[in-house]
A protein has these predicted regions:
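Alpha-helical multipass membrane-protein architecture
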Residues: 2-784
């Protein structure tokens, strides 16, 4: 017999009453999702804590710290403050559905990763679709047992749902190490076997988990570490399992499932217009002054604008306006860094003839892929476009700004939480989670030993020019930045990347070794980044009261499955898609590999040529090193001003440098429409209609997930039905040639045309005493 479908009677955050139980205390209290609800009764009987020891832009200053709930309105509106420890979680159903999503979503995302514009299918898609799948499983699967495990454990619970979603999302992003493999294959003509590829991906993806375990006390337990992205998932979990509707009241409106279905179908149908029939609605080039894009691929290229607080989005867009709409044109039209001989915005390197594709690496490399200095002098220095050069300066600034910001704002909370256990946290969620046994430290140590062994095997068994001692240095960099970066991300939903600082360090340590440079960067940067994913998921489990041990294993297993699938997809693509990662794909299916090209350019700048010939004193890009000083001074200046004006808007200034870190491969086209939608949803609606926003904000998250999923599926269908067959010949003389599909290709920006053209046989160059501003370049025969 099959189990009848049962409603999940776990009360939702919008219930009239809830029970909380901890340390022998049992109480019933009324509460509501409505932020205007008066929750001040019996405050005298509650233990109160002081507000955070730093300015927290998410903190509700007008509300006393509540013992049985969070002081953050976003958390109170999305997270329930009780737990049912008897609820099934570690079931066969959860593992089967979770593994299924750990195969599908990473595979789809890896396919899109090499395309422009790309799109990322997030775990919210799995979260939404798993709900009807889980309920169908409860209804139709027989109640048998296999090896002592129930095929059908009964009703589909919210905790099972959380476990499935975590497995779907933990490996959803393209594994960073697959970039190393792609660059080795395309740029350095190295194609090592699958064993090397698998060990490299597993070591870089999992070693961060062992490090992330160290951060739980500081980044998960404190209430101030809200992790805004997890609240999106929490709100949707509670909405789905409480059977709430998209409209007002229980039956006045569409159900979440139907709302998602309508939005999904609409997005899938609409994408055919900008994605195939009228591509001028999608593709733009240059600096993005056209403002609008009608393609969700372009709008969400840097992430959904519906899940980040407006004050953080405002920081990002102000940084974009200052550095890319003001500074970049100023640099370009004054010909700083010889930039007029290149497009204002480009992803790759140029030589001194103004030709970029490709910068001829074979002319400056020895047979073992190491750097030949004399050949480099005989050939050409490496030049970058104005926006690419500025992006390095901003990356330098973000590194020092992160450390200084953490010292100024987070030193007190770090000291407090280092000495505080889960049970001692003044947050109800931490005290509830203290009832579950923690993950043993030797589990983290075991992952570290295995992944470190894989790393050493990759270094010793294959000709990568990497060293074991350099691996230690890379891991130390990740450890140093783990807490500062984590605290910033937990509050702002923006992560500070360590890719450039690791590139700079290894460039000086191991000059002339491009593959070693890419490996060092990946272990130094992705160790920290994966630790953030691990920690973010643990915060989701913290909010949803998931025991830590099942959380740990579902993340590890799903990461192994996802990484293996992504390697399979990548190898298939390079074997079956013609001219992949070449300029010819720009006019075919779009598989130009923009992310990979940026990765390869960095390997040339920092790995082949090295920072000594690019950024040291007397070199062309030496002025960019002053951004390290700028990054250190700016947070200090803002901090001093906030001491003088404690209630001013300056308290919200903190993301100017790192917010635009996705340029390149992103461009202005991706930032402007993203900011416009973010302003509407996170400022206008939230500020003017806060009760409405608090109650229905997760509808925007459902909409975002539906747009992601519908666009992704439609893109796949368009590609495999209309573009992949016959090598793209379908409609070549008809639909592909009409004005709406060609007009955007008739611009100088699209053709990467520079402002100045080097005459045939001439070269441009620079003088040794180059200044940050001024005419330092000239075109003359062999004038390098």
């Amino acid at each position: 017999m099959s189990a009848e479908v049962e409603e999940d009677h776990r009360p939702s955050p919008s219930s009239i009453a809830s029970f909380s139980s901890f340390e022998g205390e049992k109480s019933i209290r009324a509460f509501s999702l409505n932020p205007s609800f008066d929750d001040s009764e019996s405050l005298s009987s509650r233990h109160t804590e002081d507000p955070p020891d730093f300015f927290d832009p998410n903190y509700a200053n007008d509300i006393t710290w509540l013992e049985d709930d969070s002081p953050y309105p976003e958390v109170r509106s999305a997270v329930a403050n009780y737990d049912d420890q008897s609820m099934p979680i570690n079931t066969l159903r959860a593992w089967v559905l979770g593994i299924l999503w750990a195969i599908i979503i990473p595979g789809v995302n890896e396919f899109y990763y090499f395309r422009y514009p790309s799109i990322m299918v997030t775990g919210i898609v799995a979260q939404l679709i798993s709900f009807p799948l889980g309920r169908a499983w409860a209804r139709w699967i027989p109640q048998w047992k296999v090896f002592g495990m129930a095929l059908n454990p009964g009703m589909f619970t919210i905790k099972e749902h959380v476990l499935i979603t975590i497995m779907a999302g933990v490996g959803a992003q393209s594994a960073y190490a697959t970039e190393i493999i792609a660059v080795q294959r395309v740029w350095y003509k190295q194609n090592f076997n699958f064993g090397y590829q698998w060990m490299l991906v597993m070591s870089t993806q999992l070693i961060g988990f062992s490090v992330g375990g160290l951060a739980r006390r500081l980044l998960v337990a404190p209430a101030s570490m809200i992790w805004p992205n997890t609240l999106v998932l929490c709100a949707l979990f509670n909405t789905l399992h409480s059977q709430s509707y998209a409209g007002i009241g229980r039956h006045d409106g569409l159900s979440r499932e139907r709302f998602f279905a309508y939005a999904f179908v609409s997005a899938a149908v609409w994408y055919i217009v900008p994605g195939y029939l009228f591509q001028a609605l999608s593709y733009h080039s240059g600096m993005g002054f056209s403002l609008l894009s009608f393609d969700w691929n372009q709008i969400a290229f840097i992430g959904s604008p519906l899940a980040t607080p407006w004050w953080a989005e405002a920081n990002v867009i102000v940084g974009f306006l200052v550095f890319y709409w003001f500074l970049a044109p100023l640099v370009y039209f004054t010909n700083v860094w010889c930039s007029q001989y290149m497009p204002i915005s480009a992803l790759g390197p140029y030589d001194n003839t103004g030709k970029r594709r490709p910068y001829n690496l074979t002319r400056i490399l020895n047979a073992d892929s190491t750097f030949d200095l004399q050949a480099y002098k005989d050939y050409s220095p490496l030049f970058l476009s104005a926006t690419f050069a500025i992006s390095y300066g901003l990356a330098f600034a973000s590194i020092t700004a992160t450390i200084v910001h953490a010292i100024l704002y987070f030193r007190k909370p770090i000291a407090v939480h280092l000495h505080r256990s889960l049970a001692e946290q003044p947050d109800i969620h931490a005290r509830l989670m203290s009832k579950y046994p923690p993950v043993p430290q030797w589990w983290y140590a075991g992952i570290l030993v295995v992944t470190f062994t894989f790393s050493c095997l990759c270094i010793k068994l294959y000709p990568t020019q990497m060293t074991i001692w350099a691996l230690f240095v890379a891991l130390c960099i990740a450890l140093v930045y783990l807490i500062p970066v984590g605290m910033i991300q937990a509050i702002t939903n923006r992560q500070v990347g360590l890719n450039v600082i690791t590139e700079l360090v290894v460039g000086y340590m191991l000059p002339g070794r491009p593959v070693a440079m890419m490996m060092f960067k990946t272990w130094g940067y992705i160790t920290m980044s994966q630790a953030m994913i691990f920690t973010s998921d643990f915060k989701l489990g913290h909010y949803m009261k998931i025991p830590p041990r099942p959380m740990f294993w579902c993340q590890v297993v799903a990461t192994v499955v996802a990484g293996t699938v992504q390697l399979g997809v990548e190898n298939w693509m390079f074997a079956n898609i013609p001219l992949i990662c070449t300029p010819a794909q720009k006019d075919m299916s779009g598989f130009t590999c923009p992310n990979t090209e940026v990765f390869a350019t960095a390997s040339v700048v920092f790995g082949v040529i090295g920072p000594t010939l690019q950024f040291s004193k007397g070199q062309l890009y030496y002025p960019l090193l002053f951004f390290f000083i700028i990054g250190a001074v700016c947070p200090l200046a803002v901090w001093l001003l906030t001491k003088r004006y404690p209630n001013s808007w300056l308290n919200y200034v903190n993301l100017m440098f790192t917010g635009v870190g996705l340029i390149p491969p992103a461009s202005a086209v991706n930032y402007v429409p993203w900011a416009m939608i973010g302003f509407l949803s996170q400022y206008v609606i939230r500020r003017r209609y806060f009760p409405f926003w608090a109650k229905y904000n997760c509808n925007l998250d459902v909409l975002s997930a539906a747009l992601d999923a519908g666009t992704a599926i439609s893109t796949l269908l368009v590609y495999f039905i209309l573009q992949y067959p016959r090598n793209g010949a379908i409609g070549r003389d008809t639909i592909q040639q009409w004005w709406g599909n060609t007009v955007f290709k008739n611009t100088a920006d699209w053709h990467s045309a520079p402002l100045r053209v080097v005459p045939p046989g001439d070269r441009f160059g620079y003088v040794w005493h180059c200044l940050f501003f001024g005419e330092i370049c000239s075109a003359a025969p062999h004038s390098v």
